Structures are given as C-alpha cells and as structure tokens.
Amino acid sequence: TLQKLTGPQSWAELPWGEYYREALERQLQPWWPKLFGFHLLKMGMLSAELATDKCAISHQVNVGLEGEGLQVIADAYQLPFAAKSVDACLLAHTLSYADDPHRMLREVDRVLIDDGWLVISSFNPFSLLGLGKLVPGLRRRQPYVSRMFTQMRLLDWLSLLNYEVLYQARFHVLPWHRKGGKFLCTHLPALGCMSVIVARKRTDRKSV
C-alpha cells in the first residue's frame, strides 16, 4: 500500500525550514539564469516559496492542490497541461511528500518539452536528518516523516526517463545552523541534509 503523506504548506512549518530554503536558494542561484523558455512550473508549496526571480523564464506558475499563492489548483499526477508544453519544472521536496513519487515524475516528464529542465531537491537519508528517522519519537514528525531518497535512486529514475544530469550536490550538514556548518559542508558534503539535482530531458530516447 502507498504511504499517505501530508507535506508542509511552508518551509517555516519545518524545524529550521528557513535555513533549508536559504541553503537551497544559494545552490540554485547560479542555475536560474541558464534556464530559458516560456513556462516554469513550480510544483507544490515549497517550490512556490523559493525565490526564482533570477530565472530567465518570465512566466512562472505555482501548481498544487491547496495553499496560498497558487495560480493553478491541480493534481500533480494529472497536470492540466498538454504534453511537451512546459520548459522547466521545479520539484522542491515535492517527491519527498508524494504518495507515488515515480508516477509523479513520469507525469512531469510528460509535460516537459524535449531538452526541458528539471530541478529536484530532497532530504538526504545519509545525514543527521536521516538519523532522525530511526528515532521512534521523531519519525512521525516533520521533516522526518518525509521520504528521503538517496541520490543514486533519484539518478536511476532520471536515467530511465533519459535525463542528463548537469549538476548534483549534497549540502547543509548541520540542520540547526543557518549556514549548515561551513567547515563540514566543505569537507563532508556527502553528509549534507539536503540534496539537489539539475537535469535536462534529452531527445534521443532509448528504445525499450
């Protein structure tokens, strides 16, 4: 049976959530000017809150089932957009709270144009946050209740859908520290609580 998850309506609902948001924005800042096209989908409330004003795509649409500031109310598994109509999609921890993350990824793939951009962030299970999932008193609380994917698993999914990964990183080792612990982030980035992937949908589809 699929696990029913309820995602936060804001980064502020997560312990140290504003630190996570700031850290993710710093990671993505160099990438936004490189994205181009006509339409950027920001899927879910955490995506909607991320600053994307430096993105070269001017038409940005916040999509979700409920919450403030959404332009489109829609089910992420049945997006009301034509196939290959969207230039870029941001999934900021959206898969982490998805009942069926792989199905959601396939639906996003459907609406993305060839060579479209996909940005995914999630929590890293091999981190201090990941350890929290092992503590009975914590595992039902945010953010420990979320799914935490290894980067290898996400990369496998993207490979199956024929995406080229242009950037991947783990960062923000100390969740309670605004800068994530600079020394540890420099020398032990693999233990970062957060992970991010920037990928592009490639047109040379492999025949299955």
Pin down the residues of each PLM region.
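Conserved class I S-adenosyl-L-methionine
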Residues: 117-145
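Conserved catalytic loop of SAM-dependent methyltransferase domains
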Residues: 164-192
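Short alpha-helix
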Residues: 135, 145-168
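Hydrophobic beta-strand segment of the Class I
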Residues: 89-90
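Class I SAM-dependent methyltransferase SAM/SAH-binding core
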Residues: 26, 30-79
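Conserved small/polar residues in nucleotide/adenosyl-binding loops
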Residues: 208
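Class I SAM-dependent methyltransferase Rossmann-like catalytic core
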Residues: 1-33
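A short glycine-rich, Lys/Arg-flanked "PGG" loop and its adjoining helix->strand segment in the class I
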Residues: 102-117
